[in-house]
Amino acid sequence: MRILTFTGKGGVGKTSVSAATAVRLSEMGHRTLVLSTDPAHSLSDSFNLQLGAEPTKIKENLHAIEVNPYVDLKENWHSVQKYYTRVFMAQGVSGVMADEMTILPGMEELFSLLRIKRYKSTGLYDALVLDTAPTGETLRLLSLPDTLSWGMKAVKNVNKYIVRPLSKPLSKMSDKIAYYIPPEDAIESVDQVFDELEDIRDILTDNVKSTVRLVMNAEKMSIKETMRALTYLNLYGFKVDMVLVNKLLDAQENSGYLEKWKGIQQKYLGEIEEGFSPLPVKKLKMYDQEIVGVKSLEVFAHDIYGDTDPSDMMYDEPPIKFVRKGDIYEVQLKLMFANPVDIDVWVTGDELFVQIGNQRKIITLPVSLTGLEPGDAVFRDKWLHIPFDLEKQGQHHRTREFNKA
C-alpha cells in the first residue's frame, strides 16, 4: 500500500491538497483511503460531507475517515487506564484527574498511527493519504515510534522479567500489594501497543512505499517551519519526495494591495526553489473561490498533478545511507537545513544517537560497527557524514584478545 503523508503549517491548505490527491488517486483506479489525524476535522469540510470514525464512501475507489482519538484510546488503552486510575485514586487523586493522568503525552496521536497498520493489513486499499495536524504536532506524531522505543523496551522487559514472575507470589502475601499489581489484561495491552508501534515505525520509514509531502505558503514563517520539518523528518528516516507551495497570486495581478503581496511571494518563491533543491517544488495558484466538494477537488487535483499519477515517487533519494570507502564506513544523514553547531553525535552499544536541538534519532548500527566510536562528524552538501574507522575495530579486537591472554 502506497502511503502519502501531507504536513505543513496551520492554514497553508494541506487538507485541500490531501483531499485532492486522494480524489486523483481514485480517478486513476487506486482504491484510496484518506485519513485525517487533525483534531480540527477539516476533511469533512473539504468534501462537504460528514465523516465518522470509520471509512465513509465518497465515490468509486475513494473512502475518507476522521479519526476520533478518544474512541481509539478507549478501545486500546481501557484496561491499562482502569488499572492506573484505581492506583491513583487509592493515593487520594480525584476520579477525573486520575483518568487524565493515565493518558501519556502523545497517546491520542499514537492510536491514530495504529490505524495505519490496521488498514494496510486488510488489503482493501492501494493507497493511504494522511492529512495531518500542523507541522509541530505531526513531527511529534511521526517521531513517537523512535522517541518511545527505548523506554518501551525497558518497560516491556520489566513486565516480562519482574512484574509477571512476581505478581502471583506477592499478591498472596498481602491484599495491599495485590491491589497494586497490574492485571494480566493490562500487561497484555501494553505489550501489544509496544509491538504494534515498532511495526508502524517500519511501515512509515519504508522509503519504497511511504513518503511525506510538505505544503507551505510563500511566507517567511511558513518557509522556516517547513525547513525545520524537513530536517527533522530526514533525521527520523522519513523520505520527503515533494514540496507544494500553495495560494500563489496570479502573475497578472496588478492591483495595488495584491501587487505588493505578489512581489513578496515571488521573492520567497526564489528562496524556496533554491533552498529546497533538488526536491521538486510544485507551485499552486490562489483560487477565487473555496475548494469545497468533489468537483472542486477534481479541478484542484488536475492543477497539482496534471496527467501524473500521485502515487509516483516524485524524488527518490533515501534520507539515511550507509557507505563504505576502504576501511572507512560512513553513516550519512540528509539534514538540509540543520545548523552544524546544534548537532551532537554519540554511540551506546550498537546504537548511534544523533541529536539536533531537542530532537533525537537512534540508528541501529550494522554488527561490523558495534563497539566503535564515531569519528568527527562533518556537515557537507546538506548531508551529515559520520565516519567509523574499521581498522580501529581490528585494533580494539586485538587489544581485547591480548588482555584475555
UniProtKB/Swiss-Prot annotation:
Source taxon at top rank: Bacteria
Catalytic activity as recorded in UniProt: arsenite(in) + ATP + H2O = arsenite(out) + ADP + phosphate + H(+)
Coiled coil is among the record's keywords: no
Record's signal peptide: none
A Pfam family of this chain: ArsA_ATPase
Gene3D superfamilies noted in UniProt: 2.60.40.790, P-loop containing nucleotide triphosphate hydrolases (3.40.50.300)
EC number: 7.3.2.7
Coiled-coil residues: none
GO molecular function: ATP binding; ATP hydrolysis activity; ATPase-coupled arsenite transmembrane transporter activity
Binding site for ATP: G8, K9, G10, G11, V12, G13, K14, T15
Cross-referenced InterPro entries: Anion-transp_ATPase-like_dom, ArsA_HSP20-like, ATPase_ArsA/GET3, HSP20-like_chaperone, P-loop_NTPase
Protein function: Anion-transporting ATPase. Catalyzes the extrusion of arsenite.
Family according to the record: Belongs to the arsA ATPase family.
Name the UniProt record assigns to this protein: Putative arsenical pump-driving ATPase
